[in-house]
């Protein structure tokens, strides 16, 4: 469903942000 897709994109987005902040990519 669209909602689950948005949730998954949100998780990926947060992961990328945390990666950039922590610089542990």
Curated annotation (Swiss-Prot):
Superkingdom of this protein's organism: Eukaryota
Transmembrane segments: none
Cysteines engaged in disulfide bonds, as pairs: 19-25
GO CC field: extracellular region
A UniProt-annotated Pfam family: Antimicrobial_2
UniProt keyword annotations, A-Z: Amphibian defense peptide, Antibiotic, Antimicrobial, Disulfide bond, Fungicide, Secreted
BP-aspect Gene Ontology terms: defense response to fungus; defense response to Gram-negative bacterium; killing of cells of another organism
Principal place of residence: secreted
Expressed in which tissues: Expressed by the skin glands.
Localization of this protein: Secreted
Function: Antibacterial activity against Gram-positive bacterium S.aureus (MIC=55 uM) and Gram-negative bacterium E.coli (MIC=1.5 uM). Has activity against C.albicans (MIC=58 uM).
Family: Belongs to the frog skin active peptide (FSAP) family. Ranatuerin subfamily.
Protein name, as recorded: Ranatuerin-1C
